Amino acid sequence: MMESQRQTHSGGGGFTLRSSMGRGLPMLLIPIIVLILILFSGNFYFLEYFHVVVGSAWTGMDLVMGLFFAFIMRGLSNIERAEVSKRLIPMMLFFMPSIATTTITAGIYLAAGLGIDFFSIYFIITAIIALILTVQGLLIFLPNELRIYSEILRGSRNVEKIVRLTMFNLKLSLSQLVLQIVIIVFMAHFATGGSL
């Protein structure tokens, strides 16, 4: 037990720049590469499928992070929370930004391909929400994850900082989940043409 706590404080458990990059870079690059290949192929069906899959992954991740992990973390000590943060880093730092940006990018190409009126009130609301999600993700969520990552690489000396930033990002995931559900409602309208 004491050895486990010592490892957490010293950034033990095999967490290094190389190991985290080895796990994280594929998560970052694969969705981007797949989207680029689909766009070059010009296959609308694949683009639609990709958008649904990565969008579902993004919403699912926010559901897990914003609800389940936030609930679980409340019952843990700060040292245990920091250990959980360390294990989440490859996914939160690399995968989340990748699926978020590729989902939005694919959605823009889909909207253009479907001939959606960019000046309709529904599209404007959807675009504003997507912009909010992008700003939250790239200007708040990602910098926080980089701070957590940097702190863990330095040996997790400031456990309170790691925990504070992680808990903030979990709350941010919950707010993103709510916004994504609103977007899904509008997406159903675009796909079916039904009235809201």
Predicted regions and their residues:
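Polytopic transmembrane helical bundles with strong interfacial aromatic enrichment
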Residues: 1-196
